Amino acid sequence: MGKCMIIGCGGVASVAIHKCCQNSEVFEGIMIASRTKSKCDTLRDKLQPTTKTVIETAQVNADNVDELIALINSYKPDVVLNLALPYQDLTIMDACLATKTHYVDTANYEPLDTAKFEYKWQWAYREKFEQAGITALLGSGFEPGVTGVFSAYAMKHEFDEINYIDILDCNGGDHGYPFATNFNPEINIREVSAKGSYIEDGKWVETEPMEIKRVYNFKGVGEKDMYLLHHEELESLALNIKGIKRIRFFMTFGQSYLTHLKCLENVGMTSIEPIMYEGKEIVPLQFLKAVLPDPASLGPRTVGKTNIGCIFRGKKDGKDKTYYLYNICDHQECYKEVGSQAISYTTGVPAMIGAMMIMTGTWKKAGVYNIEEFDPDPFMNALNKWGLPWEEDFNPVLVE
């Protein structure tokens, strides 16, 4: 079918690469490109004997547009799958524009020096991508990603209008460390230490970090504390789903995680402001990332399950209706299949599926689009096929 360039070689990228190699009818060739080529080579050497997909590797600095353009022109992929850092989204989009190559990512752009993420920077590329005749698919992970597909599916098949969405992200896994993050520590800690927010009646309502707490009983996991966070898909879903009055995002955290995080905040280790140390400028949060366990190393020691989904409330044929779409994923099953814990798995699988939707022409329109702006049905079918089966509940317990 075609070739895909995957930029990044962390935990999520590793899962996406494994899944591309399982899907060699679509992904005839992939190039793994990262700042550290040796990591790419190690993964290629492990996977090449197991797949018909031809794997190539390259070194690239994703902050350098000229380097990216040269590499894309050399390999000539049909689509670029950006699994690098959110700070690098715009340089990679610039390179895709210059080479007229389709673009897919899993997280929206975030300036390196400001812990604030929103879509305005990427949405500003809409006209340029339209004129170039190429597609940019934004947010093809789980959240954002599957949550948007779930929302589009609910809108298409279950509702005339959706008034309330609660996105619930529960990780019931235990890795045995006193403190570690399940994905990039720098991104994770920036996200959870920022102020929370939700959208109500078309306006953002801001909260203090971890101010709003709820308790929910998750199927396959049990009762967990969850906290309201700001999350990027709220912004696009509020625009793209008909009838929205309120949309919120909750994530579960254990008390040990929160206690450690508070201590680190109190001593300044979560700061993104540079400081001078022995004549060198360092960012405390980046230093903390260097001493914490690598999320990619958590797979063999993480047990338990995740449960991530969306509770919808709205109207169908003039009557009130509730509907819950969710996925349950087992950390150890993920590790057996691709050597990863479920957090990376639940992001890496949809990343591959999004690239497949663009590569096969199943989703085809020039411009910059969020995932809920496409037909959800082929993506929903692919989730069941490629390892993230979804479940439905037509009488869910609601979040107050």
Protein language model features and the residues they cover:
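Helix N-cap at the beta1-alpha1 junction of Rossmann-like dinucleotide-binding domains, i.e.
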Residues: 35-39
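Short beta-strand element of Class I
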Residues: 29-31
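Conserved Rossmann-fold cofactor-binding substructure of NAD(P)-dependent oxidoreductases
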Residues: 61-77, 84, 88
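C-terminal catalytic/substrate-binding lobe primarily of soluble NAD(P)-dependent oxidoreductases
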Residues: 156-400
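Conserved N-terminal Rossmann-fold NAD(P)-binding element of oxidoreductases
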Residues: 4-11
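N-terminal Rossmann-fold NAD(P) dinucleotide-binding loop
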Residues: 13-17
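Rossmann-fold NAD(P)-binding glycine/threonine-rich loop
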Residues: 106-134
